[in-house]
A protein has these predicted regions:
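C-terminal functional modules
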Residues: 261, 265-339
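Amphipathic alpha-helical segments in well-structured domains
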Residues: 57, 88-91, 120-127
């Protein structure tokens, strides 16, 4: 899981509950990278966390360990980074401060930026330096992760050589994230066949679902479907970016765990029903109805849609047809929808 959405970050209590949920469902990675944490990104990525915030992160790190979850802390320096020794040293100092809090997984995000920070050769040089002078030196740190600037196919300039440069220059053990053909998209074999040769490694999937920061007036509570069932050998990892609504996100995260642990036999509808019962066992029937009617983001700039109100679609279609063609109400269809 990657907490990488825009909007109100999760509370400390919500994160603790999430980590316990991951432990119960065998989700083994949590990447801390909320876009609205000022010490994660510009302007304060160079500064250590204040004592209170640092102690809260330490609590989360320890809770993650209790649940057999690798806690990754991500830094987002690209919007104002200077490619010089001073900033490189400040970045390592920040990582060292996080290491002292117990963090043993680190990521560097260069997504959603412009300007000097987007240069692939400079990014690769920095990541290799971190890998050589921090990750490998510590010897107890998980593989370094990079979220690149061109992180989906629609934004990739193949002729410009950005991804090829990363593939050629990055140390072999560094992981590179990818969201698919678009910012919000399902993951299939074709998108991995496209990106893996460029990166010269298996992509680390950042799946932008059920994140809803691009449709903040919607909840995405429906089944998790559409990802390939034949891609487990073509990716190095798979993490989901959730909604700012932590508890509601658990419906999808439950199914993401199902999908990643048993991809070939994954059944989206069965998993969704199990997720609903797991989240609200005493009122699963009511939550299932609510979730079934709150699953589609509606029209959006990413052109990502989901099925919604599937059980009553025939009745809705009949109602619409009767009204459009005869300016009347189909009573049977109306009764089905009302029930």
């Amino acid at each position: 899981m990657v907490e990488g959405f825009y909007g109100a970050p999760w509370s400390q209590e919500a994160r603790i509950r999430q980590l316990d949920f991951y432990g119960r469902n065998k989700m083994n990675v949590y990447i801390y990278g909320p876009k609205d944490d000022p010490y994660h990104r510009t302007p304060n990525w160079r500064k250590p966390y204040p004592a209170r915030e640092g102690e809260e992160l330490k609590v989360l790190v320890n809770r993650a360990k209790e649940n057999n979850v690798i806690f990754y802390w991500a830094i987002h320096p690209g919007q104002d980074i200077r490619w010089n020794e001073e900033d490189r040293s400040l970045l390592l100092q920040k990582f060292e401060s996080m290491y002292q809090l117990g963090v043993r997984g680190f990521a560097v995000f260069f997504d959603d930026i412009s300007g000097e920070g987007t240069k692939a050769d400079k990014q690769a040089e920095l990541l290799n330096y971190i890998d050589d002078h921090f990750v490998k030196v510590k010897r107890d740190v998980a593989p370094l992760i990079l979220c690149p600037t061109e992180y989906n196919k629609s934004w990739t300039d193949v002729e410009g050589g950005y991804l090829t440069t990363l593939g050629d220059k990055l140390n072999e053990g560094i992981k590179v994230m990818w969201t698919g053909d678009m910012v919000v998209a399902t993951i299939d074999k074709s998108t991995l066949d496209f990106v893996n040769p460029l990166l010269k490694r298996k992509a680390y999937i950042w799946w932008n679902f059920p994140v809803s920061d691009y449709v903040q007036d919607h909840l995405l509570l429906g089944p998790v479907y559409g990802n390939g069932l034949d891609v487990k050998d073509d990716m190095s990892a798979f993490v989901s970016n959730p909604m700012e609504h932590a508890e509601a996100s658990k419906i999808s995260l439950y199914s993401v765990a199902d999908y990643t642990w048993n991809m070939e036999n994954y059944d989206s509808e069965t998993s969704w029903k199990h997720a609903v019962r797991d989240l609200m066992p005493l009122h699963a029937e009511y939550l299932e109805i609510f979730a079934a009617h709150n699953s589609d983001p509606g029209q959006n700039g990413h052109r990502f849609r989901r099925e919604e109100s599937v059980a009553i679609q025939p009745a809705l279609s009949a109602l619409l047809k009767a009204y459009q063609e005869k300016n009347e109400i189909d009573e049977d269809a109306y009764r089905q929808v009302a029930e």
